[in-house]
From Swiss-Prot:
InterPro entries, per database record: Scorpion_toxin-like_sf (IPR036574)
Disulfide bond entries: 30-48, 34-53, 38-55
Coiled-coil zones: none
Annotated protein name in UniProt: Potassium channel toxin alpha-KTx 26.3
MF terms (GO), sorted A to Z: potassium channel regulator activity; toxin activity
Organism lineage string: Eukaryota, Metazoa, Ecdysozoa, Arthropoda, Chelicerata
UniProt KW keywords: Disulfide bond, Ion channel impairing toxin, Neurotoxin, Potassium channel impairing toxin, Secreted, Signal, Toxin
Organ and tissue specificity: Expressed by the venom gland.
Length: 57
């Protein structure tokens, strides 16, 4: 039973690490056209600042 719980714990940790890395890759890059992306969300304007799309409402 101990071996099974260690395996489940390792699988859980790996899935969390993979999820965090995938999310950071998506958020680290600006959208191709940040202004249009923000306007589609209802903002007045948008700019790429420090590799993040910043929307101004």
């Amino acid at each position: 039973m101990s071996g099974l719980s260690v395996f489940i714990l390792i699988a859980l940790v790996l899935s969390v690490i993979i999820d965090v890395l995938n999310n950071s890759k998506v958020e680290a890059a600006c959208k191709e056209n940040c202004r249009q992306y923000c306007q589609a969300k209802g903002a007045r304007n948008g700019k790429c600042i420090n590799s993040n799309c910043k929307c101004y409402y």
